[in-house]
Amino acid sequence: MPKSLALLAARVLSMPNFLRALVAFYCLSSAIATAQVGIDVSRISAEPSFEDFSEMSPSTALARSMTKVDDFTQRLPDDGDAASQRTEVYIGYDQEQLHVIFLAFDDNPNQIRANLSSRENIDGDDIVEMVIDTFNDQRAAFAFRSTPLGMQWDARWTEGSSMRAGFDTTLETVWESDGQVTDQGYMVKMAIPLRSLRFLDRPEQLWRIQFGRIIPRLSEESYWPPYLIDIEGRLNQTAPLTGIRNVSPGNNSQIVPF
């Protein structure tokens, strides 16, 4: 160990316990912030389909042109550990929509929980999730969830500790989802119309994003980037999203059929 690091370690160990805890918390927070790598989303030429991901792998030029995210980290039950099941996310956009494909691998696909249900009634099923802060202000975000059969749930997330913080499921917007269970796990496709979102009218967007997966039989939640219990707040743990250019925001006022 370098002498400077040895001296620093000795000083930390000589501190009272509460000061050591503060130093550890600061170092963890700094490490998370430093490791928070952003993604540059690809503009794609067509809407992706499950056929582009045959055998749960990007099998066409379109699929391979999308931006890939993986290496999810647990929040529950073991905060900070690697996810027990592999998840890959592929994201791209065109002039009208944001496109996302989830590949949720599972060692025991016959234990995946997936039920046909009404919109929003998906508690207890396996779930994949996308959270998007379209103003990059870490105050509020759109959230979209789907089950392995494509059953939808959407909400608005508000940051903070007030009574209004957390998910507001009164948000109802129009978007598309589909799902398919396979012998390796399941796939989910999301297509979010840009007119369903609110964002700044400027040539290039700077958003923040987070992907999640919930496996109820394992009581497991995992996320990319990590969404850790030891760090206060959620949207400050999202990743910067760049690359979306020359698109127009909508007014976010649509009628959702029942």
Regions found by a protein language model. Name each.
Residues A35-F258:
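Structural preference for beta-rich elements and adjacent junctions enriched in aromatics
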Residues A10-L13, C27, A33:
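Intrinsic disorder/low-complexity segments in short proteins, especially the signal peptide
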Residues M1-N17:
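N-terminal secretory signal peptides that target proteins for export/translocation
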Residues R20-S30:
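Bacterial N-terminal signal peptides
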Residues A6, P16, A31-I32, G179:
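Serine/proline-rich low-complexity intrinsically disordered segments, especially terminal tails, linkers
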Residues P16-L19, D125:
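Residue-level micro-sites within transmembrane alpha helices that shape
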